[in-house]
Swiss-Prot record:
It comes from Calliphora vicina. The keyword Acetylation does not apply. This is Cecropin. GO terms for cellular component: extracellular space. InterPro entries: Cecropin, Cecropin_insect.
Length: 39
């Protein structure tokens, strides 16, 4: 029923959040590498 629908929505949001977090970490890692190389 509607509970399952809401659960699916929350799951999708969680997936997006996780993807964004992983992407953000990757970008931060790259920036750290660039900073280390620039020194």
């Amino acid at each position: 029923g509607w509970l399952k629908k809401i659960g699916k929505k929350i799951g999708r949001v969680g997936q997006h959040t996780r993807d964004a977090t992983i992407q953000g970490l990757a970008v931060a890692q790259q920036a750290a590498n660039v900073a280390a190389t620039a020194r």
